[in-house]
């Protein structure tokens, strides 16, 4: 799951530039995604997630670390899925009239999990169901909000984020 946890903070660090929605509005008159979702953030975030996944693959293969077996496909799907989940949440937030940075408990914490899981289930279901067992799922559900909050507070302290959530 580490390849899914890395992309969002890296996207925040590296973001800026052209918004993915090209500043266009949806049929409701609101932005499709908003300025917080940029091509630079997407590319950097996915690359960082894939890179950390490749490190995991290397550690398991070289040092026989007891980590979930990853593949290049699984780390790519987890990394991309995490950011697609975040974008999906942003799309829904805009439809609900929520502003960029406005807190949306639960959705803010689990969007990356939903996106990563959905993309992986669609394109690599054998890997997903072999690795994401019930104990692993429970661990992810418990760890994710704590990790999310901690990283966001850190991002706020170092002035990468305007809000600590």
UniProtKB/Swiss-Prot annotation:
It is a multi-pass membrane protein. Its cofactor is Mg(2+). Pathway: Membrane lipid metabolism; glycerophospholipid metabolism. Its EC number is 2.7.7.67. Keywords: Cell membrane, Lipid biosynthesis, Lipid metabolism, Magnesium, Membrane, Phospholipid biosynthesis, Phospholipid metabolism, Transferase, Transmembrane, Transmembrane helix. The keyword Secreted does not apply. The chain crosses the membrane at residues 41-61, 72-92, 103-123, 127-147. Coiled coil: none annotated. It is found in: Cell membrane. GO terms for biological process: glycerophospholipid biosynthetic process. InterPro entries: CarS (IPR032690), CarS_archaea (IPR002726). It catalyses: 2,3-bis-O-(geranylgeranyl)-sn-glycerol 1-phosphate + CTP + H(+) = CDP-2,3-bis-O-(geranylgeranyl)-sn-glycerol + diphosphate. Catalyzes the formation of CDP-2,3-bis-(O-geranylgeranyl)-sn-glycerol (CDP-archaeol) from 2,3-bis-(O-geranylgeranyl)-sn-glycerol 1-phosphate (DGGGP) and CTP. This reaction is the third ether-bond-formation step in the biosynthesis of archaeal membrane lipids. NCBIfam families: PRK04032.1. This is CDP-archaeol synthase.
